[in-house]
């Protein structure tokens, strides 16, 4: 999976001395807001909000990854989400769409539910063997999202 991007607009609020960032999705709608005393902190907060939102949507079987950009638009500042962020969201989405609980998925993989839950957390770094087993368990492609 290549990186995906969420461009954002930034505004400095003089009254509160904070940077306010508003993410814009691929349909140019607001997709997350964050504020902090520095752009870097606000960007990290926006990034965390976006990941939480994508995970929540995946829990409902909704694919919101398409709301992100495949390239950061020219002259834009963007939150960058990499494969280690996005692959767990894709795995969760596929599991939910197959109507499986984490426990049922773990059983198919021959691991504990706790070990499986780690695969669905952004930042996880599953090995190739694990990803192949996930693909087989879901009868769906996952590896194409890992590159």
Give the ranges of each region predicted by the language model.
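Alpha-helix N-cap/N′ positions at the starts of helices
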Residues: 86-87, 111
